[in-house]
A protein has these predicted regions:
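Conserved catalytic region of serine esterases and O-acyltransferases that act on ester linkages
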Residues: 3-195
């Protein structure tokens, strides 16, 4: 691991030596590193800006353009991926304001979200536990994909693009527990949307 890290740092220094921002003429023009960075950030995005203003939708941070029917997703998952945040040494659980289907209300194993937006991400919990099942994601009654929490078989947060459109429109998103997994758990950690 240390050899790889050293090689990466050596490569970084080589690239810095040959890049435009570190050349002598930049310093002769009186540009500081901050000025060069500001100039670079003012340009057009290299890949695009479709998801530049993604906002979180969860139990706590609602959205006036969204109507939610929880169905059987009325529990809150407390076993979450945790990370160090804001220079704190103790870990903080990610997405604590979630919707969990606990496998007990098999007659209402559907979560429905009506939302007006351009793009929508589903953020769901990945897990290696055997009591966790998959869910089908439908948009306006059309199947989009199956959200399978066993993709990585570890405690992670998965983000999946549900739809991305040019103009905002009203959509009905249903997250339905797979028929064979009705007695298993599934956690919607939240949604990312672009108005």
């Amino acid at each position: 691991g240390h050899t790889i890290m050293a090689d990466c740092l050596e490569y970084l220094l080589e690239v810095c030596d040959t890049s435009d921002h570190a050349r002598v003429d930049s310093f002769q023009m009186g540009m500081t590193e901050e000025g060069i960075l500001e100039q670079c950030l003012c340009g057009e995005p290299v890949i695009g800006s479709s998801f530049e203003k993604v906002k979180l939708l969860d139990r706590r941070d609602g959205f006036y353009g969204a109507d939610i029917v929880e169905g059987g997703f009325d529990a809150t998952d407390r076993e979450l991926q945790s990370v160090e945040m804001d220079q704190e040494l103790c870990v903080t659980p990610e997405f604590p304001y979630n919707w969990m289907y606990d496998g007990k209300k098999t007659d209402c194993a559907v979560f429905e979200l009506k939302i007006t937006c351009r793009s929508l991400f589903l953020i769901y919990k990945d897990s290696g536990e055997v009591d966790v099942g998959a869910a089908d994601v439908l948009v306006d009654g059309v199947f989009r994909f199956r959200a399978d929490p066993h993709v990585n078989n570890g405690l992670h947060c998965n983000a999946a693009l549900v739809f991305a459109e040019e103009e905002a429109a009203r959509h009905t998103v249903c997250i339905r527990i797979a028929e064979e997994d009705l007695d298993k758990k599934f956690t919607i950690l939240g949604f990312g949307y672009v108005e």
